[in-house]
From Swiss-Prot:
Name of the protein this chain belongs to: Large ribosomal subunit protein uL29
InterPro entries (UniProt xref): Ribosomal_uL29 (IPR001854), Ribosomal_uL29_CS (IPR018254), Ribosomal_uL29_sf (IPR036049)
Membership in a protein family: Belongs to the universal ribosomal protein uL29 family.
Disulfide partners: none
Gene3D superfamilies: 1.10.287.310
Biological process according to GO: translation
GO cellular component term of the entry, any: ribonucleoprotein complex
Superkingdom, taxonomy of origin: Archaea
Keyword tags: Ribonucleoprotein, Ribosomal protein
Entry-linked CDD domains: Ribosomal_L29_HIP
Positions of the UniProt region annotated as Disordered: 32-51
Amino acid sequence: MAILKASEIRELSVEEMKGKIAELKRELMKEGVNKSTGGAPSNPGKISETKRTIARILTIMKEKEAQAENA
């Protein structure tokens, strides 16, 4: 999966964000298994970038929830 920018994430609905998080977590788990079994990662920075993307999505979801509560 490509890196998602904050502006791209903001355009998604909450349900789409949840789907992206699930997809990214599966990808992260697959990379983690590959790493733990001693395999060489296809892209060494992919694990950390995937974690950052998940955090970015969760942050924007919280922003949307807070915005909905205040409105």
